[in-house]
Regions:
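Amphipathic alpha-helical interface surfaces
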Residues: 47-51, 69-73, 77, 88, ...
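N-terminal leader/targeting and pre-domain segments
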Residues: 2-4, 9-32, 119
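Structural micro-motif
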Residues: 81-94
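Thiol-based oxidoreductase modules, predominantly thioredoxin-like and allied folds used
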Residues: 40, 61-76
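Non-catalytic, surface beta->alpha helical segment in thiol-disulfide oxidoreductase systems
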Residues: 94-119
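Local sequence-structure signature of Cys/Sec-based thiol-disulfide redox active-site neighborhoods
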Residues: 26-58
Length: 119
């Protein structure tokens, strides 16, 4: 094993920043065709930073809502799903509805991957 190999992490998720209500609306529509992963992230929260690395192991697109820059989007997610805002928070949408949600250290890449892949 090469030196430092144990500390290296491979980021597999493709993070896509959600920066408009219009983009969010499109994601809800896309969830009718395939599962959509949303991740609410606080850039000032150490817990959120740790969970970001966990979510980076998901092998799919992860739609990133940076709560400091997109409070309106975060609030709209809460309104549309009925799930109280938290950060960090992961939500998987299918057919316009949340089929999975977790916050803080309850968020795992394994759970997101399982729900996203339909297992």
């Amino acid at each position: 094993m090469e030196p430092g190999a144990l500390n290296s992490r491979v980021e597999m998720a493709n993070f896509i920043e959600v920066n408009s209500i219009e983009k969010l609306e499109k994601l809800f529509e896309e969830s009718n065709e395939k599962p959509v992963v949303l991740f609410k992230h606080s850039v000032t929260c150490p817990i959120s930073s740790g969970v970001y690395y966990e979510v980076s192991e998901v092998e799919t697109d992860v739609n990133l809502v940076i709560v400091q820059k997109a409070r309106d989007i975060s609030n709209e997610i809460a309104n549309k799903t009925g799930i109280r805002h938290e950060s960090p928070q992961a939500i998987v949408l299918k057919n316009g509805k949340a089929v999975y949600h977790a916050s803080h250290y309850d968020i795992t890449a394994e759970d997101i991957q399982r729900v996203e892949s339909g297992e």
